[in-house]
Amino acid sequence: MSNGFAIRLGAVMAAVSLVAVGCSTTDTATENKHALAASAVTVADQWVKAAPSGMTGLFGTLKNAGEHGVTVVSASSPVAGKVELHEVVGQAGGGSVMRPKDGGFPIPAGGTHVLAPGADHIMLMDLKQPLQVGKDVEVTLSFEDGSTLPFTAQVRDFSGADESYKPAG
């Protein structure tokens, strides 16, 4: 192999390598962005209200240790046929109503979002099994960037706030 040919071959290989690295950097940056929301958030003091059937609420505190705000857009759990993010809002004539929360649960940078009875919470609907006190429930949060955060929540007996979860209507 002549020196001229080897130099040209080396130059072509270097150019191909740069193009490949450039393409993979974009993919890596996208993957890092997708991992960002879930990796910045922790769930604390999480629990689920015990229920024999139907539906129930999940509560706790979502903490964002990141430098950017994130938004939880959905949740899932193998114990429920359907899971929704809910809010409780006051009505003009008094009382309050529970409804799906448009836009999800925003968590500011360095802040928290509390899920509590009578306020924002996660609804586990169409329960597939009784949720008994002391058991754990698997839940996965999904964020607007596509990342996910799995966690478990303990089932507890709770009669405070006198909440009764029933379908509307």
Feature-to-residue mapping (PLM):
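Compact, glycine-rich, soluble single-domain proteins
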Residues: 32-136, 142-169
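Bacterial signal peptide processing site
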Residues: 23-27
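Sec-dependent bacterial lipoprotein signal peptides
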Residues: 1-21
